[in-house]
Structure formats: structure tokens, C-alpha cells
């Protein structure tokens, strides 16, 4: 096959630009204008009338439309080839009916509803996989288009791209910040994305590599190619897509911690290893151009490093223990050493200078001789011509030492510093010997990678729940009454034990030994992989000072302390997750830092206290508005409390993929932060689809790092901005409280709501998924309280309710208007980025929600519980009305036409999967959830809908 245009067969295909062959009904447009804040807005759900041919593509997105069209034709050919003409015809039937239904064709609605019923499980699975394949490919095409648009921007203008490095540097200079101040500001920045596994479906590593290769070929397509060259690229794309069709989306066996680790390491090694040097070069070049200084004269410190939770997150994951931590570091070191090894080999081929033609430093010459003596017989085995090529010879020596390190043999490197010193010798020799344009650039790139990744690749945080730590303290301290003691009493007893260095009174049980073994591993890890290898020990579910002190005491029981200072050599960070913990976080830290035993610990740990704030639990507990305000206020309280002690602090945002769990662009986190809470540290947990969206391609990863730099540097420059006006805070407090009451009234007001949730969503399928190593429920909880936030959000996302992302906001806005007045609320929205970002996120969730599709799931609900669906629909109507009023808009996302268009184009392709999911759920449950074929079709539907919505949780 050549280019798509040469293919034979029907021209109708999966692409979101063609007008459907449907019967259209005339529709009117809602021309609302000038309404008051409480006037009723006619509800037009997202499933309602959207004339597809009316959706406009701006000229700058024409290339994306062409790509999607061509890829759609290709997928159609693959479906015919792999599944046969009947499968293709059914896909087309569903697709056309779904589009016509969206345009108001009642007959099409009935036909689609009838056609999805009672399909054999294997057929339903293939149909869902067909739509899923299209979405996966379109998602990739959209990412490729982002890369092309970025390149086109730089080709067409000299102006810095908004949100980029140059834009930040230009803004700093325009506000009068001198070069020295800019360099000092940058030197104080710390950007650390922390990658975590997802408890729900993630793209398999095999498919990630295939997607990378498809993206590379799409990026190479262009008008400058011959027909033969273009044809070869399209054949390569077809190969990857066809083999992807023949590959299982979801493994039949449960993913291990090792499987999850490989997905994260893919992005670190394949993407970020390549991107990091270019990121620093962009900063240097921007400073050089804007401040008119030589870029090479700018010496930037290391401001970007990476972390991971995969292999160290013990919370609700019994498969993580000391062995998995050791295995994780061993694997990470294997990969980074191999990357260095291959780079040294490539550089050895390129740096071919002869000693007769290039000046080589004495130090480098001496080091070569030293290494010759380290390896007996090396000189005899070295070709004479290579001896006269010192850089090549030395780089091959470095590669050999790296291999010895990899294999654990003698004469390997003890640590990354030794390796860096060797590479630095090459840089110094090149600089002194007129080699600035003969290899110095590439050597400096290697040095930057060593500074970033060391011999450990990424720091590993280890996390355990506070309740587990207290169970060990109770058992080891022979204190059965420990769980019933007050937090204050436990704090006093723990502080006393730390001051006396008291060990366990009885032999620990299996749980205690298992956890102490983790602490004991830390010293081994640091010795072997470097001081930055171990990140934080995170205490999840923290509610008081005693939770942190419990971790500190267990570390002492495991002898994780410096023999000289007698202090624990581990950074311990509480994770505040519940609404109450967030609201009390400042007081908790105040009490913790008042304990002399803990102050001694902090003073031995560079006077820095880490804290994590979680978005998920508080959202599940109180809804989006109350959760976000609590997080905002917690940042203020933590910054003030820790700052008042003179200690430094690092606040890490533990967020998920959806806005319900704190997802969204990195810069929004900083722009929404309270004045004074930003201190130069940006540590964000990245999880699930956000990793692929932000770091899936090298140019996208570069853009993600640039956005982080832009937002963090400008926030630091403006950190002395005025505090938020009290009037704005009062509006937000009223909004949050009223929304919380509405949310809790629905979710926790009647015990039957749990049964409604289990009936109306595919939570029972999610609970049985064999895809993640973590559990779906907390060990100590039951019912809704015990359900982890990830499956909670994922279940509502699947049904298109998107309930955790918006429910209660309408009640909150209405209450704020009633109490403070419409003009005051609008003023707060216009002037305060936090409130504006919150409302914009709620608007996006409302736009992604589809209450008409969601209503299809009501057939799964017993008649006596369907009133919950009516309550949800009424609150959706109210929230939509209030958001449109506050934004002075006619339709949701009028201010973001790109996202609005994407949702409207995608919806018809998601709808058939939802309707099939409803039918499959009904049949599976009717058979006592025993039919394996139906279950596998349901698993495919979960993946397909998630691909279409680009959201899990």
C-alpha cells in the first residue's frame, strides 16, 4: 500500500469532518442575552443538537483534519482486513447513527439503541476496540499536531511563545529584573515531576512504543517528500496500527509492580533523557538573546530532577516491600547506565580527533594512562590508530567502566560523581584545545544528564498509611490501648520514646518486620545508588503530629540514623488528604515543629520540611469546590507556619488526571496558589493519562517543562504580590460551604446512594479489573468511605456523569450570589485567578458530561432509587445555568473553542460504546457476573471510553 489516497474501497471512514448521510431536523439556536443571575437557562445537554457540518475548523488546524481523515481511511482498511466487511459495516452503522442522533434524528436514536442490544460478546468487544483504536490514533494525531503548531509558531514569528522559557525571561526583563537577579531567581527553582502508576487501565508499554513510532512517521510526513517516501511512511504506520489491533489492550493477568514500573521508565529513558539538555539550552539561549550576553557564559544549576512512586508506594498495595524497592533501583540503574554506555559509544565514534591535530590536556592524558593500568592487557588490545585518538580511546574506556558497573564487576564506578569527573575532563580538554565546536556541545549534554539522573535515574518516594505505622507502634511497643489513645497522648509518648531512643519492647510481628525491612533498605540504597536516590518517606492519611513521629520512631527502630549526629537520615513528609486534615494542616505542622525531638531531626535534614497535599480524598468527601478551597487555604497555612520557624518547605501536589483529582496544566497550579505560598519548589505527582499527554512525545515533554519553568519563575518574581482581598475569600467560603452541603446531601445523605452508585456505574467491573497492583478499597474501610478516590472518579467518568468534577457548584454559586451579591461574585471571578480557574475547570467538566447518555444507565437502577438520577440532573441544570451566567456565555466552552469543538466531534464516537456498555452490564449482572466473554467486552468498553474522553481519573 502507498499513501491513503491510493487505497481502494469505500471512502466513508472514521474521521470527524465529513457530513453524515443522515436525516437532519431543523433546529433553532438559543439566543440568550442579558439575563439575570438567577434566571432559568434553557438546558441543552451535550447530546443535543449539533450539526456536524456547522463545526468549523480554523485554517491552522487544517493539517490535523487531513491527518485524522487519512488515518480514519487507514483504520477502515485495517478493520476490513482484520475483522471482515461485516465488522466494518457495523462500525459504520453505529457511527452514522450516532452522528445523526446528535443532529436530532429521532429515528437514528431508536435505531442505535436497538442495534447495540444483545450483540455477542466477541462482536461487542471488537466494535469497542475499533472505536478505541480510532481514538488512540486521533489522540496521537492531536499530539503530533501540537508539535507541528509549535514548530510553525517559531518559524512564523520572532515573538516568544506564550507560556515558554523565552516568554518568562522577556517578562522578567521587561519588569526591570536585572541579569544577576534573573540568574539568582533561576538558581532557586526546583522542578520535580513525580510519576506514579495508575490503579486503572494504562496503555501497555508495547503499545506506547508503537504509538511513538506512528508519531515519528506522522511528523516526517510533509509536502517535501516523494510519493514513494510518503508511501513507505504510511506503510510503516499501517504496520504499527495493524499489530496494535492484534495486541491485547488489557493484559489477561494482573499487572505487577514491575509492569507498572516499566511504563514509567519508558517516559524517563525514552523521552526525558533526550529532552533535559535541550531544556537547559533553551534557558541559556533565551537569557543570552534577551540580556545580550553570550549564552555559553551562562552556568545554570540543576533545577529539574524526577521522582517516582512506582515500586515504593505501600499504601493499599501489599505487593510493595523492601524487595520491590531494591528491584526498582536495580532496574532504574540498569537503564540509566545503559543510556550512558550507548551515549559514550556514540560520542567515541564522533570525537575522532588525533593527538597530532588536536591539543589534549595533560590531566586527560594521565587519566587515560591510569585506566590502561587498571585493565591489564588493555594496551595490547587497543588498535594503534585508536591510541592516537585520545577522546575516542577515553570514551571507550568510560563505556567499559560503565559496563563493569552494570555487571557489578571490579573497576566499575563507585558512584555517578566519578563518572562525571571523567566526562568533565573531556569538556575541559576540548574547551582548552579549540574543541568548542568539535564535541564540547555533546559532552556538555552528557554532563547535564549525569547531573539530572545520576546513577539512580529518579528518586523513589516510599509511602505508607499512618494507620499501618500506628499498628506497628502498638504491637512493638506492647501497647494494645494505642489505637484508642488521643493524638495528643500518642504525640507525647512518641516524643518521649524518641528522646530516650527507646526500641521495641517485644519482637515485631510479620507486618512490623516487613515495614522495618523497608526502612533498613534505605541505607543500602543510598550507599549503592547515591544520596538522591531515596526521596521522601510519605505518611499518607496524616491527621496529627503523632503520624509523623511514628514514622520517625520506626526509622530509629530500624537504625536508619547517622552514627555521628545520631539523627535519622530520612526526609519524612505528611500527606494531608481529608478535608479535616487539610483545614488543620497548619496547626498540625505547628505542633510537630514544636517538638524538640522533631526539630533536631529537621535541623539535621537541611532545615527543610516536605508536605504533600492531596486532591482526591477531599474531593470525594466534600465535592470539588470545598476541596479546592481547602487546598488553597492549606497552602497559605503551611507556608506561614513553616516559614515562621525559619525552616524551608516543599509542598507537593498529589493530583490525578481529572480535574476532580487536581488534574490540569502545570501552570494553573501555580497561578492559583495563594500569594506567598510559592517558594521556588514545584513538585507535582503525575499519574495516568497526564503522563502520556504531558510527556508522551519529546516536544510535548519539552513544552511541559517550559510551562513549569514559565509559571514558577514568574510566580517567584511576583511572590510579594498583594494578598487576596477578604471580600473574594468570603465569596469563596460561602460558595464552598454551600456546595459541600449539596454534595454531601446527595452522596452521604441517604444510605441508598451507595447502592445507586453501584447500580448506575460499572464499579463492579472496575473492582474486578486485573490491571493494577493496588487495591480498589482501603483495607480499613467499607462502602463509599472505603472506596479509593480513583475508582470513584473513574466510575462516574465512564457513565459520562463526571459527577465528582462539578456536583454542588451550582448550589455554591447561587448561595454566593444570594449572600454577597452578583456584582461582588463577578468581581471576584474577574480578579482572582483561583476562582476563575475553579469555575473554568467546572465548566470543562460540565461540557464533558453528557446527562442524556448518562440517563441510559438508569435502566440498570431499581425503580426505587431513580430519584437520585433526577437530583443529579437538576443540579447539573442549575450548575450549568450559574456557570454560564458567571462567565457571561451562551454555551459551555465558548471561551475555549478548540476544546468545545473536540468534545462535539468526539461525542458521536463515544456514544455507541456507552450504549453497548449499558447492555453488556445488564446481561453480565443478570448472569451473576460469571460470563467471561461479557466481562472481557466490558473491559474493552472501559478502555475505549477512557480513550475517547482522554480521561480515567
Pin down the residues of each PLM region.
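Compositionally biased, low-complexity flexible segments
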Residues: 1-42
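Often metal-dependent polyanion-binding catalytic scaffolds in large enzymes
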Residues: 45-494, 509-514, 570, 663, ...
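Hydrophobic cores of alpha-helical transmembrane segments in multi-pass integral membrane proteins
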Residues: 76, 635-643, 873, 877-883
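Carbohydrate-active enzymes and regulators
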Residues: 93, 106-107, 141-145, 160, ...
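Catalytic or ion-translocation cores adjacent to nucleophile or general acid/base/metal-coordination motifs
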Residues: 320-351, 557-741
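Active-site cores of enzymes that catalyze phosphoryl transfer or operate on phosphate-rich substrates
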Residues: 391, 400-404, 455-461, 465-549, ...
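Ligand-binding clefts of soluble mixed alpha/beta catalytic domains
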Residues: 643-644, 684-819, 953
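C-terminal accessory/interaction regions of large nucleic acid-associated machines
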Residues: 757-953
Amino acid at each position: 500500500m502507498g499513501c491513503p489516497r491510493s487505497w481502494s474501497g469505500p471512502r466513508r471512514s472514521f474521521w470527524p469532518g465529513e457530513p453524515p448521510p443522515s436525516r437532519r431536523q431543523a433546529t433553532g439556536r438559543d439566543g440568550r442575552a442579558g439575563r439575570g443571575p438567577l434566571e432559568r437557562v434553557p438546558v441543552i445537554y451535550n447530546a443535543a443538537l449539533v450539526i456536524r457540518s456547522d463545526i468549523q475548523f480554523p485554517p491552522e488546524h487544517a493539517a490535523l483534519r487531513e491527518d485524522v481523515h487519512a488515518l480514519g481511511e487507514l483504520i477502515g482498511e485495517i478493520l476490513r482486513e482484520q475483522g471482515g466487511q461485516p465488522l466494518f459495516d457495523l462500525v459504520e452503522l453505529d457511527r452514522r447513527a450516532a452522528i445523526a442522533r446528535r443532529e436530532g434524528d429521532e429515528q437514528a436514536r431508536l435505531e442505535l439503541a436497538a442495534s447495540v442490544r444483545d450483540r455477542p460478546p466477541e462482536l461487542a468487544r471488537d466494535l469497542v476496540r475499533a472505536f478505541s483504536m480510532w481514538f488512540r490514533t486521533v489522540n496521537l494525531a492531536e499530539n503530533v499536531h501540537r508539535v507541528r503548531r509549535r514548530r510553525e509558531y517559531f518559524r512564523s514569528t520572532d515573538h516568544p511563545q506564550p507560556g515558554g522559557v523565552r516568554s518568562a525571561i522577556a517578562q522578567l526583563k521587561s519588569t526591570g529584573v536585572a541579569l544577576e537577579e534573573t540568574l539568582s531567581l533561576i538558581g532557586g527553582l526546583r522542578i520535580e515531576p513525580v510519576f506514579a502508576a495508575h490503579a486503572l487501565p494504562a496503555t501497555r508499554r508495547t503499545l506506547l512504543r508503537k504509538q511513538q513510532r506512528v508519531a515519528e512517521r506522522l511528523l516526517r510526513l510533509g509536502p517535501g517528500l516523494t510519493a514513494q517516501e510518503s508511501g513507505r511512511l504510511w506503510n510503516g504506520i499501517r504496520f504499527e496500527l495493524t499489530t496494535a489491533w492484534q495486541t491485547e489492550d488489557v493484559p489477561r493477568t494482573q499487572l505487577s509492580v514491575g509492569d507498572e514500573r516499566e511504563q514509567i521508565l519508558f517516559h524517563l529513558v525514552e523521552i526525558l533523557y533526550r529532552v533535559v539538555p535541550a531544556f537547559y539550552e533553551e534557558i541559556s539561549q533565551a537569557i543570552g538573546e534577551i540580556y545580550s550576553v553570550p549564552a555559553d557564559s551562562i552556568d545554570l544549576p540543576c533545577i529539574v530532577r524526577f521522582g517516582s512512586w512506582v515500586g515504593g508506594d505501600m499504601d493499599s498495595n501489599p505487593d510493595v516491600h523492601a524487595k520491590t524497592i531494591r528491584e526498582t533501583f536495580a532496574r532504574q540503574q540498569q537503564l540509566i547506565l545503559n543510556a550512558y554506555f550507548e551515549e559514550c559509544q556514540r560520542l567515541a565514534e564522533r570525537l575522532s580527533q588525533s593527538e597530532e591535530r588536536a591539543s589534549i590536556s595533560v590531566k586527560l592524558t594521565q587519566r587515560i594512562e591510569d585506566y590502561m593500568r587498571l585493565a591489564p592487557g588493555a594496551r595490547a588490545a587497543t588498535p594503534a590508530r585508536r591510541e592516537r585518538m585520545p577522546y575516542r580511546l577515553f570514551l571507550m574506556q568510560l563505556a567499559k567502566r560503565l559496563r563493569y558497573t552494570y555487571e557489578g564487576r571490579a573497576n566499575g564506578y563507585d558512584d555517578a560523581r566519578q563518572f562525571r569527573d571523567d566526562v568533565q575532563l573531556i569538556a575541559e580538554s576540548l574547551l582548552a584545545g579549540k574543541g568548542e565546536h568539535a564535541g564540547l556541545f555533546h559532552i556538555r549534554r552528557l554532563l547535564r544528564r549525569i547531573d539530572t539522573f545520576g546513577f539512580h535515574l529518579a528518586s523513589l518516594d516510599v509511602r505508607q498509611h499512618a494507620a499501618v505505622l500506628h499498628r506497628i507502634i502498638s504491637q512493638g511497643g506492647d501497647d494494645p490501648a494505642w489505637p484508642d489513645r488521643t493524638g495528643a497522648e500518642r504525640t507525647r509518648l512518641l516524643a518521649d520514646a524518641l528522646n530516650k531512643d527507646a526500641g521495641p519492647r517485644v519482637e515485631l510481628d510479620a507486618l512490623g518486620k516487613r515495614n522495618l525491612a523497608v526502612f533498613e533498605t534505605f541505607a543500602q540504597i543510598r550507599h549503592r545508588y547515591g544520596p538522591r536516590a531515596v526521596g521522601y518517606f510519605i505518611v499518607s492519611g496524616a491527621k496529627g503530629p503523632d503520624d509523623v513521629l511514628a514514622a520517625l520512631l520506626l526509622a530509629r527502630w530500624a537504625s536508619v540514623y547517622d552514627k555521628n549526629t545520631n539523627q535519622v537520615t530520612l526526609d519524612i513528609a505528611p500527606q494531608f488528604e481529608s478535608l479535616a486534615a487539610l483545614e488543620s494542616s497548619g496547626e498540625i505542622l505547628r505542633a510537630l515543629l514544636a517538638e524538640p525531638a522533631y526539630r533536631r531531626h529537621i535541623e539535621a535534614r537541611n532545615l527543610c520540611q516536605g508536605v504533600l497535599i492531596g486532591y482526591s480524598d477531599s474531593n470525594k468527601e466534600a465535592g470539588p469546590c470545598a476541596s479546592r478551597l481547602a487546598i488553597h487555604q492549606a497552602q497559605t497555612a503551611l507556608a506561614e507556619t513553616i516559614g515562621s520557624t525559619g525552616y524551608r518547605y516543599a509542598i507537593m501536589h498529589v493530583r490525578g488526571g481529572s480535574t476532580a483529582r487536581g488534574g490540569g496544566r502545570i501552570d494553573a497550579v501555580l497561578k492559583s496558589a495563594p500569594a506567598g505560598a510559592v517558594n521556588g519548589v514545584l513538585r507535582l505527582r503525575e499519574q495516568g493519562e497526564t503522563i502520556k499527554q504531558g510527556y508522551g512525545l519529546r516536544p510535548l515533554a519539552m513544552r511541559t517543562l517550559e510551562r513549569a519553568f514559565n509559571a514558577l519563575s514568574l510566580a517567584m518574581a511576583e511572590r510579594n504580590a498583594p494578598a487576596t482581598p477578604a471580600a473574594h475569600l468570603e465569596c469563596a467560603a460561602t460558595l464552598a460551604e454551600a456546595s459541600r452541603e449539596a454534595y454531601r446531601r446527595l452522596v452521604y445523605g441517604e444510605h441508598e446512594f451507595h447502592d445507586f452508585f453501584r447500580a448506575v456505574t460499572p464499579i463492579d467491573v472496575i473492582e474486578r479489573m486485573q490491571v493494577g497492583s493496588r487495591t480498589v478499597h482501603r483495607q480499613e474501610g467499607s462502602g463509599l468511605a472505603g472506596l479509593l478516590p480513583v475508582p470513584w472518579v473513574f466510575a462516574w467518568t465512564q457513565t459520562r456523569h463526571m459527577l465528582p468534577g462539578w456536583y454542588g457548584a451550582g448550589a455554591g454559586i447561587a448561595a454566593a450570589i444570594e449572600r454577597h451579591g452578583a456584582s461582588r461574585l463577578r468581581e471576584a471571578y474577574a480578579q482572582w485567578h483561583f476562582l476563575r480557574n475553579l469555575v473554568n475547570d467546572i465548566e470543562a467538566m460540565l461540557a464533558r458530561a453528557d446527562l442524556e447518555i448518562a440517563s441510559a444507565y438508569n435502566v440498570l437502577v431499581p425503580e426505587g432509587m431513580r430519584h437520585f438520577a433526577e437530583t443529579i440532573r437538576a443540579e447539573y441544570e442549575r450548575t450549568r445555568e450559574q456557570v454560564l451566567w458567571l462567565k457571561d456565555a451562551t454555551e459551555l466552552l465558548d471561551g475555549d473553542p478548540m476544546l468545545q469543538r473536540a468534545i462535539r466531534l468526539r461525542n458521536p464516537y463515544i456514544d455507541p460504546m456507552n450504549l453497548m456498555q449499558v447492555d453488556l452490564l445488564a446481561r453480565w449482572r443478570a448472569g451473576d457476573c460469571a460470563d467471561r466473554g461479557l466481562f472481557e467486552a466490558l473491559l474493552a468498553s472501559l478502555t475505549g471510553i477512557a480513550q475517547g474522553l482522554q480521561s480515567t481519573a
